[in-house]
């Protein structure tokens, strides 16, 4: 749905990168037009949710789309091939007005943008040679039962799956608070780890137990879960953090991020996009969110 909404907001044509048709003997990405019935040359919705916005829709040669939306379930990736900072800011200003947005993150090369935290804030800027999204937008999550939020979570998702079929990829706590269990002679018995743990820690811990010399090939993003190992410490120190972007002008909204840290590594809990009316805006503008994302 996001590609449809963005194309409408920008008044640009929308093409489906996952569906092609022949036009005058040449392959063309199929036109997406929700206002018209499906036909031999156009469709109402992208097949997989992704979209090429603007340009000619020609398949062969360089893609000339102004904006590319990669649908990703609970979050979508937005690429601006021209690296046009003014366009990126325009997109974020528009996203900030949508009630389904749960957080906005932008490439730090575009500088400070009200309403958005940088991709670097969540560890998504590195040395990879693959294209980096200009913007990542997380969709809103909420609980149908506030007394049991993890088991009653609802998330908005840009996907072809139907309601009840399940989805992930959002930045809600129901997505990031997964469980992990380890059994074996190297692990403590009946131990419950209260420190933050992520999937990235599995490889580091297994490499340590198997004494694999991985340091010669680089380094892992995760840590060794020493507190869970037999003979390890009872606990490791960790901290909770909250940060927020500066607010947009109208409506006044900001992206807030909650995360934990230990051993120099960050573990991201959740993000939300909210009006900071009840918050100290000066703290938000300084990069600190004085309240949680609990909803």
Describe each region flagged by the PLM.
Residues 1-163, 276, 283-294:
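Secreted, luminal/periplasmic, and some membrane-associated catalytic domains
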Residues 70-75, 181-187:
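Short acidic (Asp/Glu) and glycine-rich catalytic loops that position anionic groups and cofactors
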Residues 75-106, 185, 194-230:
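Non-catalytic, well-ordered alpha-helical segments in soluble enzyme domains
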Residues 76, 144-146, 169, 176, ...:
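Solvent-exposed soluble domains appended to multi-pass membrane proteins
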Residues 102-135, 194, 211-246:
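Polar, surface-exposed loop/tail segments
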Residues 151-186, 201, 286:
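Low-complexity, glycine/alanine/valine/leucine- and proline-rich hydrophobic stretches
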Residues 233-295:
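Phosphate/adenylate-binding glycine loop and adjacent helical scaffold
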């Amino acid at each position: 749905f996001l590609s449809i909404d963005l194309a409408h907001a920008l008044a640009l044509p929308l093409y489906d990168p996952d569906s092609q048709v022949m036009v005058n003997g040449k392959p063309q990405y199929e036109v997406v037009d929700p206002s018209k019935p499906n036909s031999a040359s156009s469709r109402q919705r992208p097949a997989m949710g992704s979209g090429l916005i603007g340009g000619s829709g020609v398949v062969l040669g360089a893609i000339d789309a102004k904006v590319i939306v990669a649908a990703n379930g609970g979050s979508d990736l937005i690429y601006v091939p021209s690296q046009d900072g003014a366009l990126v800011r325009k997109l974020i200003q528009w996203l900030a007005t949508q009630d389904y947005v749960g957080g906005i993150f932008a490439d730090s090369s575009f500088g400070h943008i009200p309403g958005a935290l940088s991709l670097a804030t969540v560890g998504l800027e590195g040395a990879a040679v693959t294209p980096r999204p200009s913007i990542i937008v997380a969709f809103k999550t909420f609980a149908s039962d506030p007394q049991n939020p993890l088991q009653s979570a609802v998330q908005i998702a840009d996907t072809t799956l139907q309601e009840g079929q399940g989805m992930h990829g959002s930045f809600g706590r129901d997505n990031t608070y997964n469980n992990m269990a380890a059994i074996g002679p190297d692990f403590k018995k009946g131990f419950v780890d209260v420190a933050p743990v992520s999937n990235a820690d599995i490889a580091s811990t297994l490499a340590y137990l198997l004494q694999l010399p991985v340091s010669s090939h680089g380094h892992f993003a995760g840590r060794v879960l020493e507190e869970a190992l037999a003979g390890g410490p009872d606990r490791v120190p960790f901290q909770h953090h909250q940060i927020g972007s500066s607010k947009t002008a109208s409506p006044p909204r900001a992206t807030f991020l909650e995360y934990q840290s230990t051993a120099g590594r960050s573990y991201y809990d959740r993000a939300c996009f909210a009006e900071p009316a009840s918050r100290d805006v000066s703290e938000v503008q300084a990069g600190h969110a004085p309240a949680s994302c609990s909803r």
